[in-house]
A protein has these predicted regions:
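Catalytic phosphate/metal-binding cores of nucleic-acid and nucleotide-processing enzymes, i.e., regions
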Residues: 15, 26, 30-38, 90, ...
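Inter-lobe coupling/hinge segments of SF2-like helicase ATPases
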Residues: 91, 95-113
Length: 226
């Protein structure tokens, strides 16, 4: 049976997360190239050169500029003169609210204390209003500190029974099975609304289909915005 079409969903992963998180995406271009350039020899006369189109879809790839992941993906997948369809990227139902804390030196104790205080204040507001919210952290340890109320978050109170935690790291050094069960439980509690606030890293995002999330809070500027 010959291949008629290859569809690559979440195509930005080919050149971003593909290296360490989704290796199948990283090697996909090489596999496609081998399929298209198989050589017939006396030992494999049945081999045929495969001719098929490739469709790649993504909602988050950057087109142009220093972080041009669109061009990188085209090169990685060995796409020749592809036709690009770029949709309307502005989401009219999304509003950005940026809070800037002035400090002579970033990441000093006073600065971190202010950031933590701001976040806890917002968490209490979200819990009181019962608005489903994801608070993203650059590191799993920060998310864990916030939930446990330690380091910059020491002495700050909120209803921890209303807050879930989901990161890609094993913060408590538990078994793989226990960690997987904790993640599943956190996801279910957040989706059902039992815990309306989720403290997470980018590990919580892919494949999450929850249509009533109201707020997405970034504790630090994301890498793509730096």
């Amino acid at each position: 049976r010959e291949i008629g079409l290859i569809i690559v969903d979440e195509a930005h992963i080919v050149t971003t997360w593909g290296v360490g998180f989704r290796p199948d995406y990283w090697y996909l271009g090489g596999y496609i190239n081998r399929l298209r350039n198989q050589i017939q020899t006396k030992w494999n006369k049945d081999k045929k050169v495969a001719h098929f189109p490739i469709c790649a879809f993504t909602a988050t790839a950057v087109n142009g500029g220093l972080d041009d992941s669109v061009s990188e993906t085209i090169i990685s997948l060995y796409m020749e003169n592809p036709i690009k369809y770029i949709g309307y990227v502005k989401r009219d139902n999304i509003r950005f609210n940026i809070s800037v804390r002035k400090s002579n030196k970033l990441a000093n104790p006073v600065y971190e204390e202010k950031k933590a205080t701001d976040l806890i204040s917002r968490i209490n507001e979200w819990i009181a209003a019962n608005t489903k919210t994801i608070a993203y952290f650059p590191y799993a340890s920060y998310a864990g500190d916030a939930l446990r109320g330690i380091k910059s978050f020491a002495g700050k109170t909120f209803d921890r029974d209303k807050v879930a935690l989901y990161t890609g790291r094993n913060l408590d050094d538990v078994s793989t099975a226990v960690l997987a069960e904790r993640k599943r439980k956190a996801f279910d509690e957040f989706r059902s609304g039992e815990k309306p606030v989720m403290l997470a890293t980018k590990a919580f995002g892919m494949g999450v289909d929850i249509n009533n999330i109201v707020n997405v809070y970034h504790y630090a500027v994301t890498g793509n915005l730096c």
